């Protein structure tokens, strides 16, 4: 992965203009880790970051929204997960990106777990990271990177992160994982076709499925 990060950073540094980078993928795919590694190699004084989690409709509301979908010849009904496009406030995110692109300062959305911060137009790079990126207009971005992993790796990572860091019940996590993964396969995975770089990232390693370099 270090070689991939190096190529991405070299491309960004050589771009020569203001740049918008979109990084997306399902939960526990490694997108935040990739974003952090890229930022470490760039000048912080010239870099903005928008994490798109605040643009996702909260699970406390989504749990009341049941959707039906067909998968491999079988009908399923389950609550709407963040892998469904309707779970995302895409228009506000697209507006905020467009504001920065037009030279306007803005503030990120404040939440109980993150403070609102300034996104300065004078900075040269805007990095937008999170699931919502996949459902926005791909033409907004100058470079788009998508990560995903297999279902087993995702569950393993979620078991560590969501249980230890977020207090999620392990039995609930395992029960909901299958339907979450099915919704991912139907609604989100096809969006990778809109990205310049596609990386399959698992505990066994990574594979570049597509690269613009």
Predicted ranges, named:
Residues 1-15, 156, 160-164, 182-213:
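NTP-dependent small-molecule kinase module
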Residues 40-49:
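Post-Walker A helix-loop "phosphate-sensing" segment adjacent to the P-loop in P-loop NTPases
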Residues 34:
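Hydrophobic positions on the alpha1 helix immediately C-terminal to the Walker A/P-loop
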Residues 116-164:
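ATP-dependent NMP and nucleoside kinases share a basic, alpha-helical "lid"
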Residues 20-24:
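Short hydrophobic/aromatic beta-strand immediately N-terminal to the Walker A/P-loop
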């Amino acid at each position: 992965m270090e070689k991939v990060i190096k190529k991405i950073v070299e491309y960004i540094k050589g771009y020569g203009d203001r740049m918008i980078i979109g990084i997306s993928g399902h939960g526990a795919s490694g997108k935040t880790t990739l974003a952090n590694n890229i930022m470490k190699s760039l000048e912080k004084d010239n870099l903005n970051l928008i994490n798109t989690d605040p643009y996702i409709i909260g699970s406390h509301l989504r749990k009341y929204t049941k959707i039906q979908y067909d998968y491999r010849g079988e009908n399923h009904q389950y609550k709407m997960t963040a892998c469904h496009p309707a779970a995302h406030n895409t228009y506000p995110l697209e507006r905020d990106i467009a504001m920065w692109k037009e030279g306007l300062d803005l503030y990120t959305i404040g939440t109980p777990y993150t403070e609102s911060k300034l996104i300065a137009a004078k900075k040269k790079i805007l990095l937008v990271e999170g699931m919502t990126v996949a459902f926005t207009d791909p033409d907004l971005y100058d470079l788009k990177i998508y990560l995903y992993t297999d279902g087993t790796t995702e569950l393993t990572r979620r078991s560590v992160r969501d249980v230890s860091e977020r207090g999620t019940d392990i039995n609930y996590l395992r029960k909901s994982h299958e339907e979450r993964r099915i919704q991912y396969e139907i609604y989100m995975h096809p969006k990778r076709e809109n990205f310049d770089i596609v990386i399959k990232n698992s505990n066994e390693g990574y594979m570049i499925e597509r690269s613009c370099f």
